[in-house]
Amino acid sequence: MNAARTGYRVFSANSTAACTELAKRITERLGAELGKSVVYQETNGETRVEIQESVRGQDIFIIQTIPRDVNTAVMELLIMAYALKTACARNIIGVIPYFPYSKQSKMRKRGSIVCKLLASMLAKAGLTHIITMDLHQKEIQGFFSFPVDNLRASPFLLQYIQEEIPNYRNAVIVAKSPDAAKRAQSYAERLRLGLAVIHGEAQCAEMDMDDGRHSPPMVKNATVHPGLELPLMMAKEKPPITVVGDVGGRIAIIVDDIIDDVESFVAAAEILKERGAYRIYVMATHGILSAEAPRLIEESSIDEVVVTNTVPHEVQKLQCPKIKTVDISLILSEAIRRIHNGESMAYLFRNITVDD
């Protein structure tokens, strides 16, 4: 890749090894140096950021991966963006491969849409643009008052399937719940493979969460016109577990955008084994793996878990050889180069559809 012109800097928003490593990969591809800054925690628990070079009039790209300590990472990003804003940076672009709180983008019970709040906070801190990957809900882009480029990791994962999975032509793409069916269908159509969907008790809990709001309370003494009686919504009842599609004697490839609830993938793998699948892969963009995840994966019927490096998971990878990583620094560095040079981003979205 050709080095971008002067007038931009790339900073790492935290000092963790994973974030620094991703930032170094990106700057190496760009032929640039990593910006000088210090991010650390005070003894009183506060986050402090110091920018150690001039950024006046430059385009600044902040790389921020989201480790298990999500709130600290968010504060690091906000404080660094604000520090760069007050230092007169021309544009401040956040490169946030996994956007935090993306699962809280819908109203649940008497909660709040936290993702919308975070979007407002980032704008207030000084960000003018965001580069991210595979938002949990594509509608999240509408929460922002500035441009958001939602890149896709699927080309990298599709390439991995074709190059690293032996006899992948004998595979079937599996959605572990009906809400993942569109993503799975996209993979199946591009690879010219069959599709299977797991439905029933193993389906995603997010689909079945009731609203939970029952207020205002019923007014006992009010007179209600007989013609105004409202029909009540029927309660949901999950059907018995079913696999729609044939996986017998096949390689099963479960695809999703996020792996955070490892137990649900383990349960799906057990079901597929019972239905005759002889090898099981799990593929996702974001591997948000808990401390227990390596043990659960190692003891399960899953043969391999493939995720990208949008989220740090090096410790879990050392504990479980089944976990494999696909590097996506290439597309992030190309996005940075194009944005800084004012080039079209269309090349990065070739053949991408709304279901990808």
Swiss-Prot record:
Keyword Ubl conjugation among UniProt keywords: no
Keywords tagged on the record: Acetylation, Nucleotide biosynthesis, Phosphoprotein
GO biological process: 5-phosphoribose 1-diphosphate biosynthetic process; purine nucleotide biosynthetic process
GO MF annotation terms: enzyme regulator activity; magnesium ion binding
GO CC terms of this entry: cytoplasm
Modified residues (N-acetylmethionine): 1
Cysteine-cysteine disulfides: none
Subunit: Binds to PRPS1 and PRPS2.
Family: Belongs to the ribose-phosphate pyrophosphokinase family.
Descriptive protein name: Phosphoribosyl pyrophosphate synthase-associated protein 1
Source organism (scientific name): Bos taurus
